[in-house]
Amino acid sequence: MGSEPKPYAQPLDSAAAASTTKGSCGPRKPENPDFFSTVEDEQEDGFLRHLSESTEDFSLDMGALQGSEYLRDLGLGAPSDLHQSEVIMDPETHRQEARRESSHTSCEGASALPQRRSWERSRSCSGSCRRLSLDASTVDKGACLPRTLASLALNLSGNGQKIWTQGCLPVSGTPAPSSKECSSPEKRLRSKSVPVSCEISCMELASDSDVCTSPVQGLEPPVLECLEKDHVEPEHVLIVQQVLQELRQYHGARQRARMSTSPGGAHSNLTWFEFLSESEDGACKIEKPGKSTRVKRSLSSLRSRVTRQKEKGKSPAHLKDKTQDLPGKRECVNGHQLMRGTFSGHSSCPLCGEPLLNSASLKEHPRTTLLSDGSSPAPSRNVGMTISQKGGLQPTPSPAGSGVRLGPIAGDMDEADSVFLKLKQTADDSLSLTSSNAESVFIEDPYIASLRCEIESDAHEFEAESWSLSVDLAYAKKQKKEVVKRQDVLYELMQTEAHHVRTLKIMLKVYSRALQEELQFSGQAVSRLFPCADDLLDMHSHFLARLKERRQEFLEEGSDRNYVIQKIGDVLVQQFSGETGERMKEKYAVFCSGHNDAVGQYKLLLQQSKKFQNLIKKIGNFSIVRRLGVQECILLVTQRITKYPVLVERIIQNTEAGTEDYKDLSQALSLIKDIISQVDAKVSEYEKDQRLKEIAAKTDQKSSGKLKNGLTFRKEDMLQQRQLHLEGALCWKSTSGRLKDVLAVLLTDVLLLLQEKDQKYVFASVDSKPPVISLQKLIVREVANEEKAMFLISASMQGPEMYEMYTSSKEDRNIWMAHIRRAVESCPDEEEDVFSEAEEKKIAEARTMKLQEFQERLSLKDQLIAQSLLEKQQIYLEMAQLSGLEESAQNRGLFRGGGDPSETLRGEQILRSAMSEIEGIQSLICQRHLGSTSSQVEEGSVSAGLPRRAETFGGYDSVGSPSKGGSFKRKVSNSDLRPQDWQGPASSPDSRPCDNSAPSGCCEESPQAVEMPSTESLPTVLELELVHRVQTLSQLLLSLQAVIAQQDSYVEMQRTAIQEREKQFRLQSTRGNLLLEQERQRNFEKQREERAGVEKLQSQLRQEQQRWERERARQQQELELAGARLQEREGEARQMRQRLDQERTELERQRQAYQHDLERLREAQRAVDRERERLELLRRFKKQNTVPGALPPEVLAEAQPASHPPSFNGDGLEGHSAPAKAPGTQGSAMLHGTGPDNVERPEVARWDSAPPESRPAKSDVPIQLLSATNQIQRQTAVQQQIPTKLAASTKGGKEKGSKSRGSQRWESSASFDLKQQLLLSKFIGKDESASRNRRSLSPVLPAAHGSAPASDPCFPAPSPAPAATPPEAFKFGGTSLPPVSPASSLPTTPLATTDEVSKEDVIFF
């Protein structure tokens, strides 16, 4: 099928299939409006729902359907009978209407309702060709209503509709006569999915760029004819709706169809989706139209799933191979010729997988064919994350210049236009895309695939979160806790290093490669975004490989997972030291310095270049990128170097101290920190340079600053070998007191004061002071009483200047002062050399030329001196020739006064040679002296020497005159020498003692002189040698003189240069130098004062420390004394505890003894009770036999011993204050109350249990009226009474002599008891007042019920034997206990009151 845009048709969705021309201008109405309106409403609702969920934008290129089977099969057969009102439209009419409606759309589209929809699921035309191909073999097998109705819905060509309808409908499905169908309410004249010709509008949509794509050349728009009375069955309408829905899905329709359905059916070669729809054909025929929406949705869902699977399985290579297999020619299937469309390369149909050919596709230009005016293609909408390739959009050709489309009629124009205006605005916000398949091609690139495999393989090795999870669980549990922590940190180091390498690979191999290949970025532009990325990747890849190797070295045998890295420090030291460390330092400095520039450049490109933006979005969809954008990558690489110290410190914390690895790790940590510090310094320096460039760029070109010496400082001078130290806002105070805001820029040698004016920096001017301050001789001082102010004093030679500057805070002031002072110290000493380079250069050149002139003059004089010396030597030689001596061959070579200065200035060597010659001369003279002595002995006569000149060569005079042509040697050797010739040299005044060494070249002897064997020839040889020696010595001395002259010249030159420098220094020693020296002296004094203050503080600190030590010693002594006292007290407490233990032991012993005595007392008490009972029985017996009144008191007194002993019953104590009781039961009760069982806690006698005769009389005080006074008064009346009857009866019995042995025993016991009672009464009398007080404190305790306080169990009542023991004997711990009387256990007052009735019966004491 072709790619030409077809005349616009509304979207062929379910709503379009069910819609009619109800809203059009035509007069035609459906015969069954209720039935089809229901279908329309249901389909419209489904369409609106689908539109709200749609997020993509695809459109149907109707021009691409021209020449296809969809349109060609509509022209088969003869035209059917048409209604008399049908309208035939030719292609020219379509084109004219399209042009008119295009302008109408652009004017009224803003107010239209959103009826045109967009679907982002486009389908290629090649796939559509396969799907729409007709198979002749299947034509006769049955009707295929969806296929034929779809074709009819697109185009109806004249009378061919009738023939097509009659031939395509099955026999069983032949419709009834039209008159019959028209009258039936269940029939309808035509479907709402097929448009009437008069209702067809040729509206054209305005594109984003107001350009339209031309249809394919050679294809004419089809002639659309509408039918009035033909109609189909309702179930056929449903199938038509399904096919139209498929057509919209396959071609991404952007329009809504408002057409009427038409009858007919034909066989077609169905695709998978058509087969699914036809499989439910039987069910669709009996279903109601309301179910069409559900069928449509199920088919759409199935289509989406299949499409996604087909899109996933396609690769670019596979698609490329298929493009070669598909012929680009027409196919003739079932009598229909289908035209292949042309598509862009490597594009494929997402449904069938077939590649699209050539240059254009529906998906590539989803809106080009719809939103254009025919001149140029419109930019397509951004489909998802699809990124366009390079290049512009290729226009799609159109035969007529504008696409003719099916669209709404005039009544729906506004609504349709508004939708497309909205789509246009949406497209303006998105980027234009050139190829929808560019992304898939790039993703499936083999290079990207291999890179993804490489990155995934690296990530797979470190996919576990920690070392504990990467090794076997049992192996991890066997390790110590410290080992596990260390291995976890090492694993984290390797894992983060692998992530860092992955980030660098993405930067270099994804982004950088894409920029170079896709956008043709230069290497410099890429390096600006990713500086030094390749070097960093190389270094870190090597580091990661070393870490993996170290991990491999420590793998357990037989395992590929379990490992414990024992040593890692050497790898870290190797990575961060040496050449690798320097390289890392350099590269990270460059990368970190360019961080801000890279981010700024990226943002700028992202804003200005749509191609760059598209490429970044495209790369962002890659799976290997994983949300790592350019900024994220740059930031991660910048921060990576700062992560190493943290990891290494954690490794050190879990490493045993003192080991070799611990030392290596510590060294690696120091190296890493050093690298980071240097990188920070480089980054800071780079940032300062960038800031200086920004300031210079912002500075006004015309602005300049005048210096004190008159020179000018301009904008260009800022960047001339100057660095920025500090910049910030200051306030410059004028003489009037006003503050002016300035920007202070501290450079290497100057301080600039700028101010902002019209967004430009200009040199500030306050009080006509120069805004450029030289740092040479600059003095910085604080302002008194001003924390934020400082003085800048420029001690220049041209005149000092003082600036008063203010900062925002004291801290800023101190920072500025410190930076300025450091800059002054590091500033060159030459004053203002940077400002007067030209003048200084001229002065230096003049000085140099002058010194060179002096040097030339001195050299000339040295040459003259050397020449004079040479001439002088020549004279000497001539004189020697006159004397007949031969000239030496090396005479002229010995003196080099006129040679190279490097050879002449060898004074030391010349002097040594001269000394050697002198020594040789001395030895020769000695030898000659010996020879002349021997000759004098032989001849016997001494001849005097010839006269000589002092300054000649040895003063030698020869008798023979030398010939002119002979030499000095020859003449000497051939002449007749006389003995007196040897005397001259011996007495020569020029001979002096010297060294023994002589150079070999200075004393050459002739062969004749050396080989003379006779003694006569010896003086001649010595004479010749002596002459040579003297001549050589003369030459050496002359050379030394020349050297000395030259050295004098050099010395003078140096002295002159020194004097020149001193002069310059003296010229610079002006007032500025004095001020600077004063400032230095002041600073020195200030430092000395500060040092003195520090020393004073140190002395105070030492004194405080000494005082503190003394105080501490004193406190220590006090603590020692307190400790000693505490120990003493502890000893005393220990002794007291021992004494207490002893006393407690003694008391325990006494208590045990007391208990023993108490038991004895109780036994005795029980015995007394038994005796008392017996005596009571005896008394009763006596009472019965004795008359009470006949007995006199004496008898009673004698019978007293028979009564109870008072010491046992306690009645003696009561006898003084209470009357005697009656004998009988009362006495037994009293004895029972004082029995041994009640000794410790005596019981109080009950009032109602007492016998009537023992109760008190009425005359006594009642119980409720008892008081302390009554008790005291009753107790004071203590008297002893003896009943007369008892006394009489006792006396009578005595007189009768009826005493027995028992009565005698009772008498003796009674007398003993009486004595004991008397003693006890004495003791009781002493404590009577105390006992009264105790009884008076309890007024509510009556005499009848109250009893004395219970005696302590530890102190029983006294036994009869120790009755006389005083109370003081019972003491515990020095505390006396109150004595307990026997009467304290008995009731007092009630018993005494009741006994008054029977005084005769009982005797009381």
UniProtKB/Swiss-Prot annotation:
**Record's function text:** Acts as a guanine nucleotide exchange factor (GEF) for RhoA GTPases. May play a role in actin cytoskeleton reorganization in different tissues since its activation induces formation of actin stress fibers. Also acts as a GEF for RAC1, inducing production of reactive oxygen species (ROS). Does not act as a GEF for CDC42. The G protein beta-gamma (Gbetagamma) subunits of heterotrimeric G proteins act as activators, explaining the integrated effects of LPA and other G-protein coupled receptor agonists on actin stress fiber formation, cell shape change and ROS production.
Every DH domain range: 485-682
Could you tell me which residues carry Phosphothreonine? T952
Q: Name one GO biological process term.
A: actin cytoskeleton organization
Q: Name one GO cellular component term.
A: cytoskeleton
| ZnF start-end (C2H2-type) | 347-372
Put simply, this protein is called: Rho guanine nucleotide exchange factor 18
